[in-house]
Every structure is written in C-alpha cells, then in structure tokens.
Amino acid sequence: MPYKISRAAYAGMFGPTTGDKVRLADTELFIEIEKDFTTYGEEVKFGGGKVIRDGMGQSQVTRADGAVDTVITNAVIVDHSGIYKADIGLKNGRIAAIGKAGNPDMQPGVNIIVGPGTEAIAGEGKIVTAGGMDSHIHFIAPQQIEEALMSGMTCMLGGGTGPAHGTLATTCTPGPWHIARMIEAADAFPMNLAFAGKGNASLPGALTEMVLAGATSLKLHEDWGTTPGAIDCCLSVADDYDVQVMIHTDTLNESGFVEDTIGAIKGRTIHAFHTEGAGGGHAPDIIKICGQPNVIPSSTNPTRPYTVNTIAEHLDMLMVCHHLSPSIPEDIAFAESRIRKETIAAEDILHDIGAFSIISSDSQAMGRVGEVAIRTWQTADKMKRQRGRLKEENGDNDNFRVRRYIAKYTINPAIAHGLSHEIGSVETGKRADLVLWNPAFFGVKPDMVLLGGSIAAAPMGDPNASIPTPQPVHYRPMFASYGKSLTNSSVTFVSQASLDAGLKGRLGVAKELVAVKNTRGGISKASMIHNDLTPEIEVDPETYDVRANGELLTCEPATVLPMAQRYFLF
C-alpha cells in the first residue's frame, strides 16, 4: 500500500504539486500548479540520503548514450504556455527535455536520463522562468549589462555607442563602423546581445549598409527626424532584409500627426516604443496606435505602474535625457506635453486587457535596466487590486494574468524581433537561458541565472567562508561569465544578410552569431501571445481622456507598491 504524506510535508520535501498555490513575492498574485509531471513516489532529489545516487535515481548511462548535462529537479515552471511542475533536462546549452527525470533502468516514465555526468540543480520550492528579454536598450554604459543579468534578463536589444549624446537620447548604433565595434565588444559580456542601427534616412543606401554590418533592427527616433519619408524608407529596407523597425514618433507633430504616421507605415509590421507617449511620440494621442493590427505596442518601465510619484519624476528625467534646458520655455513646454496622467493611467489598463504587448526598460534614458521584471509584476498587482480577477481566469488563481504579464518580457519581444526560435520560453529545443526564483523574491531577486545551460550569476556569500551562505551575500558573476565559457554560453544576434556577407570572418569575434528571422509580414499584433487585443482608441485632445471601444480607461495612482522598499533594505 502506498505511503500517504500531507500536502504540507510533500511541498516541504519536493515543492508544491498539482492544486497547490504559490504567492508571488509580496503581491496579491497567486498561481496554482496546473499539472505535475512527476510520478508520485519516484521523484528525484539530490542530497545526502536522497534519490540521485548511483544505482538509485542516477543511472549508468553515458552522455553519449543520452544522459543530460544538467537536471533541474521538481521546479515550478511559470511560462506563457502554462504553470506546471516538472524536471528540466539541459544538454549542449539547450533545453533537452521537460518532464520526469531519473534512472530509466528502475524508474517508470523517465524522459530525462540522469547519469554520472549529470549535474543537479535543486528546483524544489523554486520557480523557473525563461530569461527575460529587454528590447529597449540604450547602450550608454557597459555596466548596465551586469545590472540586467542580475535582475533576470538574459537578452538585451537596442542601440548605442556609450555615453555619446546621440546614445543618451536614442537607441541607435549609427553606421557600419560603430556596429562593428559594438559586436566586437559583445564578446566581453555574459549576455545575449543584439544591436539596432539608425533608421532615420530618406534614401535606403545608408540603412542597407547598417543591416549588412549586422544590425538586427532599425530604430526611427524623433531626435533624428521621424518624418513620413524616413518611416517609409526604413520599413522598405526592413522588408527587403527581414529586420524589425522600432519607432519613436514626432512628439511636436512637426512633420505630421499620428494619422500621418499610420499612413506612412502602410500596414507594415512595426514595434512602437513607449506607445503611451511619456517616453516620446505624437502628443497627446500616440496611444491610439495600439489599436492598429500591424503595430506591436510596448511600454518602458518608468510609467509602470501609474503611481503618485510618476508625473513628478518624469519631468526632470525627460529634461536630462533629451538635452533640454529648464531656462528655455519651449523646452519646458516640450517636456510637459509628453507627461499626461490620463494616458499613463490608461496604459495600466491597456496592459491588463492585453492591448499593450511588451514591457522594456529604456535603460538610463528614461528607464531602469534592472527593473523590467519588477515593474511588470507591480503593474499586474496594481491591476488585480483595482480591477479584480480577469474574466479569462479558470479557478481561484491568477494564472492567466501571470501568463499574460510574463509574456510581456519573454516570448513577445522575442517574437517581435525574430528571436523566438532561440529564446523567450521554457521550451524543448530552445537555449537554456533560465532563471530560478525563490517565490518570496519572485521578480525581484533571482536565485540563479543560467546562460546557455551554465550558471552566469547568483547571490553568493563570503568566498572565504566555510560555506556559501555567510554575509556579505550579494550578486556575483559565476563561471559562465568568464573566459571561453562566456563566449560559448551567450550569442550575438545579427541579420541574416550580414552573415551571408561574411560578417563572422570579417570581425573574427568569438561568440556565435545567430540570425534573426520572421520579423516582417509573418508577424503582427496577432502574434503577441495573450497580448493581441486591438481596441479602437480615442483620446480627447482637451482633457487627454482615453477611451477603448467607447469605454473610459482610468484608474487611481498607486500610493504603495509591492516588490519595493522591503526588498532593498540592504
């Protein structure tokens, strides 16, 4: 007769199982385990007196015959595809299998073979997510990369050359020479990186040479002149070479209004940055563009979520970022035209209903590179408190809302930028760029960050201590952040055209160069998982009130947020 164990005792030993609920950090978001792939009584666990021992949960199978390199045991997987419990097998830097690990010689249902060559990572009581992707990076300082990695990001896409004034304001790496230098620099960093060229030109020649130099995308920014002619030219080049276009539209409406921009886009796929408008764009109604079926709308994190401090901090932030002077009245008017509490409040709700698809940072250029995950989950929590459960929920949990929000910084930016064949989800065959979290610290402070199946970062105590836990415990780079392990554990994404033109041999970089694909007509707003709603948006030009399909979108600013000061006392 099988031995019976209480749910509490089981969760304490192997982690929660089907039907158990887990609170995410100090939010009001609760997930419920939908399925457990284990066989009860046959769970594998590492440690003294535990299961993964020779002749027990560990087989005699060699790596060549199918044993995995690493097994993550009994983890709760939180992904756009579902919330479930499983073992995860990693091999050759990729996710080899998800399911039941163990010794097939003596255990039933094993699809992940543990052998003498297998390392074990204890996932009991932990959450595993795909590494995050931040698709709005100003490469102002290389130190951003470590900050992002330690927050759970494993891919950064954007533009820049360092603290040049063009980079301080715009996410562009202009020209083939600068793109080459940035791709060369990428070899130094434990992070998957991708670079955007400048998209502002009325003739295609200069844009084409940037794509051939390795740009994965082209960025149209108003500070370089986002005119209808530049928009049309840039999208035409992107269509020719299968790269994405990101757009920051004309705040001052000098060369046209939002309707003119929509007309210049001509129904082609485009990623609209900070679509609410505080980060820049046609004032006051750029937010209308999120209802277009060809536009993939995103947010940058300073407006996430709307709080009592949002408006005040944005004015000073904007003056610095866009090289404006507080002594020039026109500059002050420019800044004030972009900061509107009505559209920021509406942005909260548009995220919650799935009309905004992506959340990113806008690093050091009106955005915080280490807070993409935090701001995403703070928005989700605020919306649950203010709007209640989503109608799509099934059962007494927040699973659908959690799946909607995690998609905003994992799978959806990966789809938008042609990287989803490699990253963006916990899925067999994809890169093993994974993040482990203690549920109490979910979204705030990771337990471990893996890049290409190797540990790149983790909190670690005093290296001279007798055990790993004594203070001071802080985030430190791990072995995948050093030497050839670094360049073998992460990649640099480039255009297919640049690979065809011999970029790898020309630059002689150590990292693998991987081509983006399917960024144009094969994707649209409908491709944004759990975030594909296209409501008709209206903005009152006098009051800035926002309506979606006739319904007024408004909410109160938050006065208190979770995942905030209590997590950062030290």
Curated annotation (Swiss-Prot):
<dbReference type="InterPro" id="IPR005848">
    <property type="entry name" value="Urease_asu"/>
</dbReference>
<dbReference type="InterPro" id="IPR011612">
    <property type="entry name" value="Urease_alpha_N_dom"/>
</dbReference>
<dbReference type="InterPro" id="IPR011059">
    <property type="entry name" value="Metal-dep_hydrolase_composite"/>
</dbReference>
<keyword id="KW-0378">Hydrolase</keyword>
<keyword id="KW-0479">Metal-binding</keyword>
<feature type="domain" description="Urease">
    <location>
        <begin position="131"/>
        <end position="570"/>
    </location>
</feature>
<dbReference type="GO" id="GO:0043419">
    <property type="term" value="P:urea catabolic process"/>
</dbReference>
<feature type="modified residue" description="N6-carboxylysine">
    <location>
        <position position="219"/>
    </location>
</feature>
<dbReference type="InterPro" id="IPR032466">
    <property type="entry name" value="Metal_Hydrolase"/>
</dbReference>
<feature type="active site" description="Proton donor">
    <location>
        <position position="322"/>
    </location>
</feature>
<feature type="binding site">
    <location>
        <position position="221"/>
    </location>
    <ligand>
        <name>substrate</name>
    </ligand>
</feature>
<dbReference type="GO" id="GO:0009039">
    <property type="term" value="F:urease activity"/>
</dbReference>
<dbReference type="InterPro" id="IPR006680">
    <property type="entry name" value="Amidohydro-rel"/>
</dbReference>
<comment type="pathway">
    <text>Nitrogen metabolism; urea degradation; CO(2) and NH(3) from urea (urease route): step 1/1.</text>
</comment>
<feature type="binding site">
    <location>
        <position position="248"/>
    </location>
    <ligand>
        <name>Ni(2+) 2</name>
    </ligand>
</feature>
<dbReference type="InterPro" id="IPR029754">
    <property type="entry name" value="Urease_Ni-bd"/>
</dbReference>
<feature type="binding site">
    <location>
        <position position="362"/>
    </location>
    <ligand>
        <name>Ni(2+) 1</name>
    </ligand>
</feature>
<protein>
    <recommendedName>
        <fullName>Urease subunit alpha</fullName>
        <ecNumber>3.5.1.5</ecNumber>
    </recommendedName>
</protein>
<dbReference type="InterPro" id="IPR017951">
    <property type="entry name" value="Urease_asu_c"/>
</dbReference>
<dbReference type="Pfam" id="PF00449">
    <property type="entry name" value="Urease_alpha"/>
</dbReference>
<feature type="binding site" description="via carbamate group">
    <location>
        <position position="219"/>
    </location>
    <ligand>
        <name>Ni(2+) 2</name>
    </ligand>
</feature>
<feature type="binding site">
    <location>
        <position position="274"/>
    </location>
    <ligand>
        <name>Ni(2+) 2</name>
    </ligand>
</feature>
<keyword id="KW-0533">Nickel</keyword>
<dbReference type="Pfam" id="PF01979">
    <property type="entry name" value="Amidohydro_1"/>
</dbReference>
<dbReference type="InterPro" id="IPR050112">
    <property type="entry name" value="Urease_alpha_subunit"/>
</dbReference>
<dbReference type="GO" id="GO:0016151">
    <property type="term" value="F:nickel cation binding"/>
</dbReference>
<keyword id="KW-0963">Cytoplasm</keyword>
<comment type="similarity">
    <text>Belongs to the metallo-dependent hydrolases superfamily. Urease alpha subunit family.</text>
</comment>
<dbReference type="GO" id="GO:0005737">
    <property type="term" value="C:cytoplasm"/>
</dbReference>
<feature type="binding site">
    <location>
        <position position="138"/>
    </location>
    <ligand>
        <name>Ni(2+) 1</name>
    </ligand>
</feature>
<dbReference type="InterPro" id="IPR017950">
    <property type="entry name" value="Urease_AS"/>
</dbReference>
<feature type="binding site">
    <location>
        <position position="136"/>
    </location>
    <ligand>
        <name>Ni(2+) 1</name>
    </ligand>
</feature>
<comment type="subunit">
    <text>Heterotrimer of UreA (gamma), UreB (beta) and UreC (alpha) subunits. Three heterotrimers associate to form the active enzyme.</text>
</comment>
<feature type="binding site" description="via carbamate group">
    <location>
        <position position="219"/>
    </location>
    <ligand>
        <name>Ni(2+) 1</name>
    </ligand>
</feature>
